[in-house]
Amino acid sequence: MSLHRLILSLLVAVGLSSCAIVPGDGGQGETTRWTMLMVSPKDDVADCHLIRLPDGRKVLIDAGKLGDSPGAALAAVQAQNITALDLVILSHFHIDHYGALWDLIEAGITIKRVAINVPVQAAADQEKGWGCNLDHVRATLKKLDDHHIPYFTPKTGERILETTTAQGTVVALDVICLYDGLNSPIGLTDVNETSMIVRLSHGSTRALFTGDLGGRLGAYLATSNFDLKADILKVPHHGSEGCAPNEFFDRVGAKAVLVPAPKNLWASGRSMRIRNYFIEHHIPTYVSALRGNVTAVLTATDFRIESER
């Protein structure tokens, strides 16, 4: 291994890619801000992403809850001075992606609507005792009903939110695809493969949210006709093995990636393939446990990345 590659490998392994220079806003006016909230301070994994739109609306993608830091998501959201959310998107029903929704509601944060994708019984039953708990999912939906919070399941290709800036730039959230765990192009899947794939666009600048997209569906999408191109990628499955294959990353073609992962997991062998891919492709990599809150600032033609450390 050359000295250059060795240095680059070490930098990406700790989430400090030497290619961290990214485009700026270029004076493009209003911005959309996506903050990957740091909710993995110990060893458990979770996802929680806050989007602030130019018109003032706020969206949360996932609200994960961890066994070793159960209050992390609520604390992170409250630290952003959030009292109301116009939309919450739950990518899929694993507790590390939706468990803190209860906490947000009980803390008095107003939630206007929730986008969900409940897996079929056959998919959930494969994970009894360790993965998706449909009884808890039903209890969560009842909690939404009890608090008069509407929820819905979008369709593939549906635009679930749109606004236009003063400069005439369209900002939107689009559902690229979602499957229920049975009616999919690869048949019966696990619950990770029911992850709602969502694209945030601000003009021509794009960010792709992938939940815990796994290897089988990821391989299918890599050869599909879906438009997966994005400037910034939320790496699926906390950047660990079992996530989408390298061919999926090729299709996305991201210029920067955000990884919601604890430090030990990212440094482990479980993340080696993913780490090495971004090293070899010289893609700036931002890991939440190492960089704290990481914010992607999107403009009509560009983006920049900011982090706490």
Model-derived features: positions:
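Bacterial N-terminal signal peptides that target proteins for export
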Residues: M1-L8
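C-terminal motif of bacterial Sec signal peptides marking the signal peptidase cleavage site
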Residues: S17-S18
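Core dinuclear metal-dependent hydrolase active-site scaffold
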Residues: I21-A84, D145-K229, G292-R309
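Active-site metal-binding motif and surrounding structural segment of the metallo-beta-lactamase
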Residues: P54-V59, G67-A122, T223-S240, G253-L258
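Internal alpha/beta domain cores that form substrate/cofactor-binding pockets in large enzymes
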Residues: A230-V252, V257-T295
